[in-house]
């Protein structure tokens, strides 16, 4: 009988302990694992994960390295890229200092305000930063937010996007970057507090204060409004970098009124809007100007770093079309190569595209739309027309929407060998 009992005695397949020696033994297909081995495995995984987080946070590139990477994707805005690189470096340096230091001095959080005209590169700067730092990133539109209890999105939904982009890894999300666009659209309607409820303006600013400063927020896992019978995801926003962006149309007039010297009669200097250098005016912005625009003092206090961007001129728009790593010209050439068709942009065409973007006042954001309009019919026909080997975009093509088509010598195009693209992982440090 004793021999039969020994045979029936179950053991952990990993440590060899019998079921009598452990609290619990869990069975799998042909294997067993005890509670002690499960706990040990859990500790190993947890330790490795914490090490990974620490490595990511301690290997933050220096400001020069951050700017060098931004230079590859963002044309112009030299001062803005410098300021942003320093601010981001200091943000993650602060995280490391507060995590590792026993010092009484605790470094305060500094969120960033990107201020510049439409199409100047605000969103692109934030996206490129997050990609370089290899941290989760989320974009939110401030115009969709409303104060809790009203139709629209709660501010916590911003954090849900970040959590989703971190694959629900809360610790990674807590070191991410959130870009809130159109922040100028939540300015209160007048400088004086109103007795009526401003649910999409001042109310949203009030709701954003806590997450900007740093709090443990309760986020509904499915989004939407909170209700008392659902579970929440808890996330600490203390180490999340918030970058707010907006065009702030009209703030240049506020700055000008503050900075100009009052002159009367013949000494008065009158400038038209075209003659004003709005970029220079924006560089003189002070927190008081933001208050006059309609941001509340508490909100301005939580975005202490103000980075201004200039409107892009013709030369900058032409450079954007062809110079960055993912320039639009390069993207469209690759698209055509996938159909074994060569695409050529003449310099005169790039100039015409830039001029059209300036006319529309859309900045870099409008360049893609103009190219799409120019090549819509060609992109529709090319896959079906095997005889077309090359497409040339010249100045006339931008206005007539009729690019020059060149047929293959033998009546059928030959395959184009595509270069293999190299994907980049993690931050590139020197």
From Swiss-Prot:
Taking every annotated instance into account, which residue ranges of this chain make up the domain ClpX-type ZB?
1-53
To which species is this protein native?
Clostridium kluyveri (strain ATCC 8527 / DSM 555 / NBRC 12016 / NCIMB 10680 / K1)
Give the protein family. Belongs to the ClpX chaperone family.
The UniProt regions of compositional bias labelled Basic residues, in chain numbering, are 414-424
SMART domains per the UniProt record, alphabetical: AAA, ClpB_D2-small, zf-C4_ClpX
Q: What does this protein do?
A: ATP-dependent specificity component of the Clp protease. It directs the protease to specific substrates. Can perform chaperone functions in the absence of ClpP.
* Identification of the protein by name: ATP-dependent Clp protease ATP-binding subunit ClpX
Q: Which UniProt keywords apply?
A: ATP-binding, Chaperone, Metal-binding, Nucleotide-binding, Zinc
What's an example GO cellular component term for this entry?
Answer: HslUV protease complex
Q: Which Pfam families match?
A: AAA_2, ClpB_D2-small, zf-C4_ClpX
Q: Mind telling me which InterPro entries this protein's record contains?
A: AAA+_ATPase, ATP-dep_Clp_protease_ClpX, ATPase_AAA_core, Clp_ATPase_C, Clp_protease_ATP-bd_su_ClpX, ClpX_bact, P-loop_NTPase, Znf_CppX_C4
PANTHER family recorded: ATP-DEPENDENT CLP PROTEASE ATP-BINDING SUBUNIT CLPX-LIKE, MITOCHONDRIAL, ATP-DEPENDENT CLP PROTEASE ATP-BINDING SUBUNIT CLPX-LIKE, MITOCHONDRIAL-RELATED
Q: Tell me the superkingdom of the source.
A: Bacteria
Its quaternary organisation is: Component of the ClpX-ClpP complex. Forms a hexameric ring that, in the presence of ATP, binds to fourteen ClpP subunits assembled into a disk-like structure with a central cavity, resembling the structure of eukaryotic proteasomes.
Q: Which GO terms describe its molecular function?
A: ATP binding; ATP hydrolysis activity; ATP-dependent protein folding chaperone; protein dimerization activity; unfolded protein binding; zinc ion binding
Q: Which residues bind ATP?
A: 117-124
Question: PROSITE patterns this protein is in?
Answer: CLPX_ZB
Q: Which gene encodes it?
A: clpX
Q: Which GO terms describe its biological process?
A: cell division; proteolysis involved in protein catabolic process
